[in-house]
Amino acid sequence: MPHALLASGVRLYYEEYLPVRSSAGIPVIFLHGFMLDRRMWTFQVERIGQAHRSIFVDAKGHGLSDCPESGYGRDERVEDLLLFADILSLERFHLIGFSMGGSTALGFALTYPERLQSLTLVAAPLARHRFFKWVSRLDTIAREQGADVAKKAWLNYIMPYYAPAELHEVGKMMHQMIVDQPLAVWNDPLRGKYHTESDNERLQQVSTPTCVIAGDKDRVFVEMAAIMNERIPSVERHIITSSGHMVPLERPELFNNIALQFLERTSE
């Protein structure tokens, strides 16, 4: 199994796919959401992975990557991504991030813009947004009642939001993925204490061509997508109809078309 060994000693698991009929071109890195892993990109492997060199990486504490005691804040994830790209000798790349991965991707674009060819933010949250206030309740549960209780609370809360009842197969996939995730993130003694500067006033500093995607039923993220659309200088926004939070799984064909067209336009 391929792992990238970071200078910190943490190993990140990843899977890489090369296009069948063309040169590899500029690679694409995919970042998954919280309590998920590379498997959430299943339908992108089938389509985007055939057109572009595509790398799907598990964040630490997720999937098959290592689970250190601490170091799960956004700034830490940004540095992990830099080290990961250096290990794979990726001088410049496209970056697609979903939810937590979108936050990481935005942080990376603000810190290391020279490494990015394009930026795609899917159902991505803005740091310090009011959305995170309810997450702090889970941090309290983790500290007072234990990581296992917090993970179950997250699962019970998020499943109806991630996968509505009518999307039975998506729901099964999501449930299993969340159940499979380690408890390390919840056990982090610094959980809830990482400081991340508000993104709102920094969005104008994003110099990378950006594509913002959200599902029309994902109201709070549609709101954040509107803020990004207003403030990021070079940006396009797509609101996917009949979709909630899990756009890449709920509307894979439409998502793939939008992502591929954006990758093609920004690869020149």
Spans of model-derived segments:
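Conserved acidic catalytic loop of the alpha/beta-hydrolase fold
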Residues: 76-93
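Conserved alpha/beta-hydrolase "acid-adjacent" motif
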Residues: 219-224
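Conserved alpha/beta-hydrolase catalytic His-Asp/Glu region
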Residues: 130-132, 147-204
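Gly/Ala-rich beta-loop-alpha elbow adjacent to hydrolase catalytic centers
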Residues: 97, 101, 105
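Short beta-strand/loop motif that positions the catalytic acidic residue
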Residues: 206, 212-214
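Catalytic active-site module of serine/aspartate enzymes centered on a nucleophile-bearing elbow/loop
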Residues: 235-268
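Conserved HGGG/HGGXW glycine-rich cap/lid loop of the alpha/beta-hydrolase fold
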Residues: 10-70
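Flexible "cap/lid" loop of the alpha/beta hydrolase fold
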Residues: 106-111, 116-147
